[in-house]
Amino acid sequence: MIIYATEVETINSFVRLESLKELYSLVWIFVPIFSLVLGIITGVLVIAWIERELSAGIQQRIGPEYAGPLGILQALADGTKLLFKEDLRPSRGNTPLFSIGPSIAVISILLSYSVIPFSNHLVLADLNIGIFLWIAISSIAPIGLLMSGYGSNNKYSFLGGLRAAAQSISYEIPLTLCVLSISLLSNSLSTVDIVEAQSKYGFWGWNLWRQPIGFIIFLISSLAECERLPFDLPEAEEELIAGYQTEYSGIKFGLFYVASYINLLISSLFVTILYLGGWNISIPYISIPYISILELFERDPIFGTTIGIFITLAKTYLFLFISIATRWTLPRLRMDQLLNLGWKFLLPISLGNLLLTTSFQLFSL
């Protein structure tokens, strides 16, 4: 009986160990996801504060200064206010479409972060088709905006949703052609491989210098995809009140507010990855032992990951500065001007750039 009891206790201890292993594995699956979500929320708060301060400086006025030191908690206060506001719904609208629209817009943008490498050791999913996965997922967001506009049963909202769909289609094609040019130069669709291909040649190996035309087209197309001035036709205040957001209030309106900043952040991150070398730390005219730094990254992954995150975010916020300054300095385009720019100028130029890149790659074989 004593031996039998001992065997039972041993079996129970093994069962407990196996259950603990399964629990730990589940925890470690969700830890990077929650860390990424926390980082995104922090990034959105920082972007909102930078835009308020920068816009105040451009317009020569005082920005937020009461909520926290230098008004750094103003965005958090605005989000808290929207969280506790009443969630109104149009009485004659399509309630399912009206409710699902904001969620589709936010989730489709959040999923794009899964293929963004902050260093060669920090990426949720290093896929062979990572860059195309981002394009495919980002094309779902306009469907949510169109659903929101149609479900609101409001002519301003519906027109805003139609404008969002038309604008997305017009600028998604030039953006995709620019991505194809980068993929041809890197011989890969993986975001990690694209950054490593640029890192081989240091600063002058960045795709910014190898694809200057594609960089300008990608920059304009990404601003149009984010629906920022001068491309904010779907929510033009003077024409459509707030576009597809007209009937929204409370947390649903806050989701659109957050989605716009998340989309701006992810566009800036992809500009950094595709054209600015990602976590590449080479600086021109300054002698940096790049090989020794790579060896240090391999020896100490934690240090390499920390430095990679810092460099990637530094380049990203530099592009964010350009995007915010563009919003507060340029006037809004008309709808016909926006479509003409996309179809008559950016599309032919991006197609020509792709043909030139293809020819160069063929002759270099």
Curated annotation (Swiss-Prot):
Annotated S-S bridges: none
Keywords annotated in UniProt: Chloroplast, Membrane, NAD, NADP, Plastid, Plastoquinone, Quinone, Thylakoid, Translocase, Transmembrane, Transmembrane helix
Parts forming coiled coils: none
Family assignment from sequence similarity: Belongs to the complex I subunit 1 family.
Organism listed in the record: Arabis hirsuta
One matching Pfam family: NADHdh
Listed name of the protein: NAD(P)H-quinone oxidoreductase subunit 1, chloroplastic
NCBIfam families in alphabetical order: PRK06076.1-2
Annotated transmembrane regions: 27-47, 98-118, 129-149, 165-185, 203-223, 253-273, 302-322, 345-365
Quaternary organization: NDH is composed of at least 16 different subunits, 5 of which are encoded in the nucleus.
Subcellular location: Plastid, Chloroplast thylakoid membrane
Gene Ontology molecular function terms on file: NADH dehydrogenase activity; oxidoreductase activity, acting on NAD(P)H, quinone or similar compound as acceptor; quinone binding
Entry GO terms, CC: chloroplast thylakoid membrane
Catalytic activity: a plastoquinone + NADH + (n+1) H(+)(in) = a plastoquinol + NAD(+) + n H(+)(out); a plastoquinone + NADPH + (n+1) H(+)(in) = a plastoquinol + NADP(+) + n H(+)(out)
Main location: plastid
GO biological processes: aerobic respiration; photosynthesis, light reaction
Enzyme Commission numbers on file: 7.1.1.-
Membrane topology according to the record: Multi-pass membrane protein
Function (record text): NDH shuttles electrons from NAD(P)H:plastoquinone, via FMN and iron-sulfur (Fe-S) centers, to quinones in the photosynthetic chain and possibly in a chloroplast respiratory chain. The immediate electron acceptor for the enzyme in this species is believed to be plastoquinone. Couples the redox reaction to proton translocation, and thus conserves the redox energy in a proton gradient.
